[in-house]
Amino acid sequence: MSLLEAIAELHVIPYTDVLAWVVMAAFIAGVAADYRDNLLAARRLTAGAWWLFAVFWFVLIQHFAFVHRSVVQTVLILIAVPACLYVGWLVFAGRDSLLTLSRAVAFMTVIYLPFETSELARGLLIEAVAFQTATVIDALSLADGMEYMQDPDEGSTLMNTFWFPETGRASRVVFECTGIGAMSIFGGLIAAVNAPLRRKAVGIALSISIIWVLNIGRNVFIALANGYQWFAYSWLEGPIMALFGLTDPARVSFFVADRVLAQLLAVVALAGLAWFIARWVPELLDIAEELLSIVGIDVELHHPSVDRTDTDPAD
């Protein structure tokens, strides 16, 4: 067994599930202290939550680098670890403007964790996304002969697999393919800002709807790219197999479609979506300004279609 294979055999997810609940509890405790105007306790609890969050991401480096083999996500996590440590230090030192961002993280975990840790909720979400992905592929006649079937893995009863007889390749919709992570981020950010409830509701409804549609399109693209081997070019095989530690050339199309193109485009799409949603919830720009200021970029962001002096720019 190679060193990479040995590292990939390590299982950290059960421990990170427990740690995630601890992190959520710490952030919620900080939010509760803030609501009770106990600023000193809020700073200490929230700073501790950020430092625990750094530990959480650090533990996940192995999973995303050697099991999931995602370059984009691994780079983001490597940035997240020192960023969480630094934000925690700033909060502890009295930078109270970061309590809004901390409140957003608390809401994100409240949205995300029940789906991630509940087998029933996770299964329902996966099957809903898989069914709609298969429906779009069939409706657009993009894959003649594709079979939508039950997960062949032993012990799984989920209808989440697309098999392409023409190439013998199959793709599965798993939890990471549901878009719940992005929906949790936007839901948490919008819930955390100080804005009228109606505008927040519009922002959440729009962001979740757009993310859901984009995610279905993403799954359609990945399933077809893998099923029909769209990126099976000899000049791609060497670099991609070396980058991701692959031994089977038939997996190159999947990794190019998912780990490279889809994930890079997702970062761009989410940034664009945040700018779009700021039309209804311009308070999101305050969080963006705060994040930029952490890295030494002091700017004042203005959405071109929003008057920041208006109390309800959605009207």
UniProtKB/Swiss-Prot annotation:
EC numbers on record: 3.4.22.-
GO BP: any one term: proteolysis
Gene this protein is translated from: artA
TM stretches of this protein: 12-32, 47-67, 74-94, 173-193, 204-224, 227-247, 260-280
GO cellular component, one term: plasma membrane
Catalytic center residues: C177 (acyl-thioester intermediate), R218 (proton donor)
Coiled coil regions in record: none
Keywords: Cell membrane, Hydrolase, Membrane, Protease, Transmembrane, Transmembrane helix
InterPro entries: ArtA (IPR014522), Exo/Archaeosortase_dom (IPR026392)
Family: Belongs to the exosortase/archaeosortase family. Archaeosortase A subfamily.
Job of this protein: Transpeptidase that recognizes and modifies its substrate by proteolytic cleavage of a sorting signal. Following cleavage, a covalent intermediate is formed via a thioester bond between the archaeosortase and its substrate, which is then transferred and covalently attached to the cell membrane.
Native species: Natronomonas pharaonis (strain ATCC 35678 / DSM 2160 / CIP 103997 / JCM 8858 / NBRC 14720 / NCIMB 2260 / Gabara) (Halobacterium pharaonis)
Protein name according to UniProt: Archaeosortase A
